[in-house]
Amino acid sequence: MDVVILDTGCANLSSVTYAVQRLGYTPVISRDPAVVLRADKLFMPGVGTAHAAMEQLRQRELIELIKSCTQPVLGICLGMQLLATSSEESGGITTLGMIDAPVKKMTDFGLPLPHMGWNQITAQAGNHLFRGIPDGTYFYFVHGYAMPICPNTIAQTNYGEPFTAAVEKDNFFGVQFHPERSGAAGAQLMKNFLEM
């Protein structure tokens, strides 16, 4: 199986690479359209600001390439946020628009921001991405912006208020947390994605 980690220019690709390798796969890091479109599974990790990430995608001519993908794509952290229509970050920017929902600055409910550390998720019953992962399982989060609950939400987390922890639309999946840093539960989620 061809597993590709998209070289977005805005991510720590090594931790995702190692996590995929531990599951017995040999991922390729690439931004070559031929390699990306031939992939059976595509990971889209991202860290940093949405503005800088979209600029990297623009410079690398990846925006239309991502939108044209028909295989399962998993956006991780900022990679998930980029699937939204817009982000309030950097004064408001347009993002990829696969999920019809915005990403908003998290509200200060007296809890430390950014939201950093382990938190529990509640997943949609029977969703394939969360197979074998019980409700209440902890995943590792690092973010100050979040997608509100929307029709494409498949898992949510509460941090002062509920927000989208995972999203799915057609072949596009996204997780706000870092599965590659979430121990056995994160490995199970990545395995579920790779076995779709």
From Swiss-Prot:
> Entry's NCBIfam families?
IMP_synth_hisH (TIGR01855)
Q: Where is the active site?
A: C77 (nucleophile), H178, E180
Per the record, what is one GO cellular component?
Answer: cytoplasm
Give the reaction(s) catalysed.
5-[(5-phospho-1-deoxy-D-ribulos-1-ylimino)methylamino]-1-(5-phospho-beta-D-ribosyl)imidazole-4-carboxamide + L-glutamine = D-erythro-1-(imidazol-4-yl)glycerol 3-phosphate + 5-amino-1-(5-phospho-beta-D-ribosyl)imidazole-4-carboxamide + L-glutamate + H(+); L-glutamine + H2O = L-glutamate + NH4(+)
Which CDD domains does the protein's record reference?
GATase1_IGP_Synthase
- Assembly, per entry: Heterodimer of HisH and HisF.
Give the matching SUPFAM superfamilies.
Answer: Class I glutamine amidotransferase-like
Return the protein name.
Imidazole glycerol phosphate synthase subunit HisH
Per the UniProt record, which EC number(s) apply here?
4.3.2.10, 3.5.1.2
Matching PROSITE patterns, A to Z? GATASE_TYPE_1
Enumerate the spans annotated as Glutamine amidotransferase type-1 domain: 2-196
Q: Which UniProt keywords apply?
A: Amino-acid biosynthesis, Cytoplasm, Glutamine amidotransferase, Histidine biosynthesis, Hydrolase, Lyase
Q: A GO term (biological process) for this protein?
A: L-histidine biosynthetic process
Identify a single GO molecular function assigned to this protein: imidazoleglycerol-phosphate synthase activity
Q: Where does this one sit in the cell? A: Cytoplasm
Q: What does this protein do?
A: IGPS catalyzes the conversion of PRFAR and glutamine to IGP, AICAR and glutamate. The HisH subunit catalyzes the hydrolysis of glutamine to glutamate and ammonia as part of the synthesis of IGP and AICAR. The resulting ammonia molecule is channeled to the active site of HisF.
**Organism, as annotated:** Yersinia pestis
The main place the protein resides is: cytoplasm
Pathway connected to this protein: Amino-acid biosynthesis; L-histidine biosynthesis; L-histidine from 5-phospho-alpha-D-ribose 1-diphosphate: step 5/9
Give yes or no: UniProt keyword Glycoprotein: no
- Report the domain of life of the source organism: Bacteria
